[in-house]
């Protein structure tokens, strides 16, 4: 299974829309869809400061965990979700830093871009709608 950043790199390098849709569909995962939704859906607002927090990226080949596991923690960072709104901001930011330090550094860059609402290169709303209907509002 490809890491999320590998899938999105492949999409970015593809020229044809049908190839991009095929790549997304073949590599469908909740982690991939969460990154896309969190980056592109305006109804998702993050309960974290903008920019990039100070963190120590993991060594890619030795990352202790993966985005496939850690994406489940995104609920602690979304505004309007009780798990996030009820959490102490320092604890929330500490949890976020732990998440990005534990995953592959390229996936960590995607997560940071996501909370800053920077959409992955090569993706458009119509493309995402074709691959994953209804994912992005």
Task: Name these PLM-found stretches.
Residues 1-137:
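N-terminal nucleic-acid-engaging modules of covalent nucleotidyltransferase systems
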């Amino acid at each position: 299974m490809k890491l999320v950043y590998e899938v999105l790199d492949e999409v970015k390098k593809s020229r044809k829309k049908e190839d991009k849709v095929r790549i997304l569909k073949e590599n469908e995962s909740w982690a991939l869809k969460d990154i896309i939704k969190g980056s592109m859906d305006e109804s998702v607002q993050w309960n974290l400061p903008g920019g990039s927090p100070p963190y120590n990226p993991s060594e890619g080949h030795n990352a202790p965990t993966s985005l496939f596991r850690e994406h489940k923690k995104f609920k602690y960072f979304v505004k309007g979700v009780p798990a996030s709104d009820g959490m102490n901001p320092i604890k929330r930011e500490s949890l976020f830093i732990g998440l990005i330090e534990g995953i592959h550094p390229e996936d960590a860059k995607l997560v940071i871009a996501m909370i800053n609402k920077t959409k992955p290169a090569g993706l458009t709303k119509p493309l995402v709608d074709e691959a994953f209907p209804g994912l992005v509002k």
